[in-house]
């Protein structure tokens, strides 16, 4: 099951974190911050808010979610402009002022922030392990994702699943079968889905956000 879900995450990253795919930004292209987010003059909140306005102005729809690569999220947490916004927050020994996904989502007016820090082994079977992040580390995707799917419901993208075949809304099925002759159980997993960008103007990809 873990290997299948890793494959699904990999396909998601390849599809939705692809370069030169999204057009919802102020430039119509991917955004490279003029001041990197790990520098003294970098301000991820200002940069992201600019693109939130740009998408709203272009489409009439305000983005509601953001997905960060591991390094992109780390530089946001350590960014002086971000720290300055929350350093006077209420704190106690049991509830210190800190920055997490909910804090940044609240500042940006987003419903959800996801940190995509999933790791996989890139080497061939039997070779020495070569571990890496599935999602591009220094990138972040700002997007609008519909709460519920619908033919007339705008959304940056959808994951279409073959539910009649798998009898599963997730597009994943695990089967366990007994082989009495071999005195063993056979476990099979299969997936049937397609990941598609359906509205490229409802997404903005930030890339190379750190130095």
Predicted regions and their residues:
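Alpha-helical scaffold segments that mediate packing/assembly in large oligomeric complexes
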Residues: 1-62, 70-92, 208-211
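Sequence/fold signature of self-assembling virion shell proteins
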Residues: 31-43, 83-211
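A structural signal for short, well-ordered beta-strand segments and their strand-loop junctions
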Residues: 65-69, 114-115
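Short His-Asn-centered micro-motif
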Residues: 68-70, 144-145
């Amino acid at each position: 099951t873990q290997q299948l879900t890793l494959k699904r995450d990999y396909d998601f990253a390849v599809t939705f974190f692809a370069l030169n795919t999204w057009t919802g930004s102020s430039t119509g292209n991917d955004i490279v911050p003029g001041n990197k987010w790990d520098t003294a003059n970098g301000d991820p909140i200002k940069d992201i808010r600019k693109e939130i306005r740009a998408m709203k102005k272009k489409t009439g729809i305000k983005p509601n979610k953001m997905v960060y690569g591991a390094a992109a999220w780390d530089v946001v947490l350590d960014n002086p402009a971000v720290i300055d916004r929350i350093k006077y927050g209420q704190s106690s020994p049991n509830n210190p002022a800190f920055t997490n996904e909910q804090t940044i989502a609240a500042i940006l007016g987003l419903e959800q922030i996801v940190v995509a820090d999933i790791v996989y082994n890139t080497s061939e079977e039997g070779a020495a392990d070569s571990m890496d992040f599935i999602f591009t580390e220094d990138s972040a995707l700002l997007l609008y994702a519909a709460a519920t799917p619908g033919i007339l419901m705008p959304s940056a993208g959808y994951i279409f699943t073959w539910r009649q075949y798998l009898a599963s809304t997730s597009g994943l099925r695990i089967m366990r079968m007994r082989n009495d002759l071999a005195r063993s159980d056979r476990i099979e997993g299969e997936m049937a889905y397609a990941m598609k960008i359906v509205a490229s103007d409802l997404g903005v990809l930030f890339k190379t956000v750190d130095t």
